Amino acid sequence: MTLLALGINHKTAPVSLRERVSFSPDKLDQALDSLLAQPMVQGGVVLSTCNRTELYLSVEEQDNLQEALIRWLCDYHNLNEEDLRKSLYWHQDNDAVSHLMRVASGLDSLVLGEPQILGQVKKAFADSQKGHMKASELERMFQKSFSVAKRVRTETDIGASAVSVAFAACTLARQIFESLSTVTVLLVGAGETIELVARHLREHKVQKMIIANRTRERAQILADEVGAEVIALSDIDERLREADIIISSTASPLPIIGKGMVERALKSRRNQPMLLVDIAVPRDVEPEVGKLANAYLYSVDDLQSIISHNLAQRKAAAVEAETIVAQETSEFMAWLRAQSASETIREYRSQAEQVRDELTAKALAALEQGGDAQAIMQDLAWKLTNRLIHAPTKSLQQAARDGDNERLNILRDSLGLE
């Protein structure tokens, strides 16, 4: 049995290839059935995200194994083999185990240390459990990777610092306000970045969020998810005074929030401070706003400096994480080797028990026919001894003929001979 990990990711393949190799959720069962129909495959898990498509397999060794699996992947997706080979990586046994642990821990992600990948790996594993998982070693490898990912997050600072613009914006807000549960947040825009910001804020117990967007329909979908109120962009001037925090990310070519608008809001708030985080490019907030007393304006460049600093911290934590992965990989491979020995022991014991049962049955039959009990028992003992020592004796003789002293010593040790 061999463990394999093969696939492509954001480091080896452009998005144009990654999207062609991805497995859609509605066809995943079909793909797993097709994969497990391959004669060499004993068990399989398919991990398919926007940044990677990987197959984790338990296989029987055979000639042209790599070619057979690449051919299956190309046939399934109707790809040219040469196009795929240039971007494909292939890991076996120790390297496959280490790779999965690194992936689950966020060490192989586009955003170093990002936590979402662990959930994606867990889902891929759960999907494979629906009648597709046939290899206990593969199952154990995934379970081990989950515990390793948890250990990495617990024992290192890999996830402690923000390295995405959305997360950095929320981290900044948490640093300035003692508690986010009592503040009102105005989100301007409803795109992907604002979606991430809104979800982060909800996780930090923000009770009141207002979403201002050009189109109400898109904003309403997000508002329903996070429990926010939706307003039009034209209502910002009137509602701005309610907001303690404003986070803006639109595609507007011109600023949406001007200096005069913020001045009026501050006056209505009796100069209670406001935090404005402008993630947009071009900017949504006029730079002059930053000159106002009690208005604290941060641009995407300010966030980028925070992210760069935090990324350096994550890279330092990643070194510690790699040490954990190496240690856990070594322990898993030791367990795997022990499992291999256990199977050999089971086969050897089963073989011995089969000989015992066969000879005992013959002896009992002879006794039932009235044979001499002492002679029958002596014959049983003699035959049982000869049958059990036959194979080891042949191995000892062959090692002696070959002059293989190392093998002779191993056999002597195995047989308990001094």
Swiss-Prot record:
Keywords: NADP, Oxidoreductase, Porphyrin biosynthesis. NADP(+) binds at G189, A190, G191, E192, T193, I194. Coiled coil: none annotated. Activated by Mg(2+) ions. Inhibited by metal-chelating agents such as EDTA, EGTA, 1,10-phenanthroline, 2,2'-dipyridyl, and by PtCl4 and KPdCl4 as well as Ni(2+) and Co(2+). Also inhibited by iodoacetamide, N-tosyl-L-phenylalanine chloromethyl ketone, and 5,5'-dithiobis(2-nitrobenzoic acid), as well as glutamycin. It catalyses: (S)-4-amino-5-oxopentanoate + tRNA(Glu) + NADP(+) = L-glutamyl-tRNA(Glu) + NADPH + H(+). Changing E114K: Loss of activity. InterPro entries: 4pyrrol_synth_GluRdtase, 4pyrrol_synth_GluRdtase_dimer, 4pyrrol_synth_GluRdtase_N, GluRdtase_CS, GluRdtase_dimer_dom_sf, GluRdtase_N_sf, NAD(P)-bd_dom_sf, Shikm_DH/Glu-tRNA_Rdtase. This is Glutamyl-tRNA reductase. It comes from Escherichia coli (strain K12).
